[in-house]
């Protein structure tokens, strides 16, 4: 009798995508609790993550997200800029509550603030950059799922997904895989059906690149106008040192007067007041 296959068997296609996005590339430092997820170490001292554990923990995290009946009670945070777009896209397809950017202190503990929320699950991109949200979650006994690198502290983290949480490609792929697995478990997407959403839509994009493109087009247009401007033919300037023969013998300037022979011929027509 053949042994039953485990549901947490790593998918070869997902593993191949992780290798392409460099999800397995860790750091030179390693936390003691993260050593069990390290596969090996390179000659440069960089620790490599075992992607089998990564995919296994990712499926466990997806099951924890599905257990929350109201998707809006799942908060996904990312203080790291590379994870802001991935968090927004993940929340768009899953229905969670995204917080991209700076975490406002007191979001989970201060009921007076307008941003106060009471979620049931927290998903963090980096335990170091999202330390404030993890600390507040410990005050309210909120379970936490986090993308953890080899040097990430596991304080206040309940489910750690070992991966590279510093590269924009790695962060985007991890949120894409997590969103797809959540849709699988919710039966909104069949496992034999490919997801029509590309991983590229989760990538972080620099807004300065979009601001430079219009300027470049305007400059090229101005250059075309300058190069295509018609040239005006240059006529030779007249030589003022030469004398017109028609006026060569006209020494009397009285001829230049407007129909008058002498300047004294003008009659003063003003009234005599005396």
Swiss-Prot record:
It comes from the Eukaryota. GO terms for molecular function: structural constituent of ribosome. It comes from Theileria parva (East coast fever infection agent). InterPro entries: Ribosomal_uS2, Ribosomal_uS2_CS, Ribosomal_uS2_euk, Ribosomal_uS2_euk/arc, Ribosomal_uS2_flav_dom_sf. This is Small ribosomal subunit protein uS2. Belongs to the universal ribosomal protein uS2 family. GO terms for cellular component: cytosolic small ribosomal subunit. Component of the small ribosomal subunit. Mature ribosomes consist of a small (40S) and a large (60S) subunit. The 40S subunit contains about 33 different proteins and 1 molecule of RNA (18S). The 60S subunit contains about 49 different proteins and 3 molecules of RNA (25S, 5.8S and 5S). Interacts with ribosomal protein S21. The keyword Ribonucleoprotein applies. Keywords: Cytoplasm, Ribonucleoprotein, Ribosomal protein. SUPFAM superfamilies: Ribosomal protein S2. It is found in: Cytoplasm. The keyword Ribosomal protein applies. PROSITE patterns: RIBOSOMAL_S2_1 (PS00962). Transmembrane segments: none annotated. HAMAP family: Ribosomal_S2_euk. PANTHER family: 40S RIBOSOMAL PROTEIN SA. Required for the assembly and/or stability of the 40S ribosomal subunit. Required for the processing of the 20S rRNA-precursor to mature 18S rRNA in a late step of the maturation of 40S ribosomal subunits. One of its GO terms (biological process) is ribosomal small subunit assembly.
